[in-house]
């Protein structure tokens, strides 16, 4: 089993470049939100993570090892989670996203939830019932798929709950400009940019 980002990161972490323009996900996610979210928030987590590990033995550790082994280190947990979570978030969205999954992923969704629509309903519920800031996740766990949510910048890898293959950011900075307090409307719109091909690749890597 591997995760979407199993390659060990050393010599400091770098803010990943997006594979699409900031305005490419409009009208579902607006360009200003994307730019601030990537160039300020994600960049901040990256810089703060590097500062937290600078000059320590942690510089030789990969991001996933850091998140698990240094879970009690608040700076590493918060900023490492923010770095990893956003990297997954960007990579599972696309201007040509939306639609429905196919192949092995579609079969696994049916096996685990009964149908794609039921999975979406359960996922949206996890996103909506997460109090305050956090994330909702679709994970591989024990060969099947599960849904959960985590607070702040935590993720299921940190506690061994599963390998996330898809996640949605429900911090207010991810949606407030376009949707105000309408988290449900944001999550509904987000489905239109989910890159199911990328999610399927994550699934195959994780099983």
Predicted regions span which residues?
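Feature for soluble, non-membrane regions of globular proteins
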Residues: 2-207
């Amino acid at each position: 089993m591997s995760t979407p980002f199993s390659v060990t990161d050393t010599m400091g972490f770098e803010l990943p470049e997006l594979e699409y323009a900031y305005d490419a996900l409009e009208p579902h996610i607006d360009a200003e939100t994307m730019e601030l979210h990537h160039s300020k928030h994600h960049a901040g987590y990256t810089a703060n993570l590097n500062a937290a590990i600078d000059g320590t033995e942690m510089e030789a550790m990969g991001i996933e090892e850091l998140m698990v082994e240094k879970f009690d280190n608040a700076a590493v947990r918060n900023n490492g989670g923010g770095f990893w979570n956003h990297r997954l978030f960007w990579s599972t969205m696309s201007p040509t996203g939306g639609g429905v999954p196919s192949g092995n992923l579609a079969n696994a969704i049916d096996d685990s939830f009964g149908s794609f629509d039921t999975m979406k309903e359960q996922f949206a519920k996890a996103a909506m019932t997460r109090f305050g800031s956090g994330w909702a996740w679709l994970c591989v766990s024990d060969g099947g798929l599960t849904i959960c949510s985590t607070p702040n910048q935590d993720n299921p890898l940190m506690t061994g709950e599963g390998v996330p293959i898809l996640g949605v950011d429900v911090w207010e900075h991810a949606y407030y400009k376009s949707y105000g307090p309408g988290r449900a409307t944001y999550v509904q719109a987000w489905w239109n940019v989910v890159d199911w091909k990328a999610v399927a690749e994550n699934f195959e890597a994780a099983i």
